[in-house]
A protein has these predicted regions:
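Cytosolic-facing regulatory segments adjacent to core modules
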Residues: 1-23, 28-29
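Anionic-ligand binding region
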Residues: 47, 54-80
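Beta-strand-loop-alpha "switch" segments that mediate conformational coupling across diverse proteins
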Residues: 86, 97-128
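C-terminal boundary of histidine-terminating zinc-finger modules
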Residues: 123-141, 145
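Non-Sec secretion/translocation targeting segments of pathogen effectors
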Residues: 163-167
Length: 167
């Protein structure tokens, strides 16, 4: 067993008990992220609405491609989620435009944008989910909308798959 496959082996037993298993990684390309990509069926890439995270997309796409070639040929990218976005700023709007222009033809860029809000940091510091901490706030509402968007995309993919099987 290679060290890149450790998480995949661990999750193999759990998969039968869950519809979804979410693996949240730090924004680095270390061994934990490689393990997560090797174990995942699909990946949602969060990108902060700033210059450097957008530039890091190139490296991440190379890493995902390498993982697909060497460890997990079935890994697919479900989409990119813009996060920590203050859409009142030119930087955030430019980042979104650049993301959609440079990647949107090949990768789904989710419509939902997660706004920047101090409540997100406060909920983490309090050890609570955003829904426990500020369930009616803009961040919680955005994540709820994002969840609906992901489920809707999954249903479309499942229906497409089922219709291709019935032919």
């Amino acid at each position: 067993m290679s060290r890149e496959q450790t998480l995949k082996l661990y999750l193999a037993d759990l998969k039968k008990d869950y519809d979804y298993i979410l693996i949240d990684c730090m924004p680095s390309l270390g061994m934990l992220t490689i393990n997560a990509l090797a174990a995942a069926d699909s990946v949602i890439v969060p990108v902060q609405a700033h210059y450097l995270p957008l530039k890091g997309m190139t490296q991440l796409m190379k890493t995902i491609s390498k993982v697909q070639r060497q460890l997990n040929p079935n890994l697919k990218i479900d989409g990119v989620l813009l996060t920590l976005a203050d859409m009142r700023t030119k930087l955030a709007r430019t980042t979104e435009d650049s993301l959609r222009e440079n990647y949107g033809k090949h990768i789904r860029i989710f419509k939902t944008v997660i706004p920047v809000a101090i409540t997100a940091a406060e909920s983490s510091a309090a050890g609570q989910s955003i829904y426990e901490y500020d369930k009616n706030g803009t961040v919680a509402k955005a994540y709820a909308e994002f969840t609906r968007e992901v489920i809707q995309c999954g249903e479309k993919q499942r229906n497409k798959h089922e219709s291709s099987l019935s032919r």
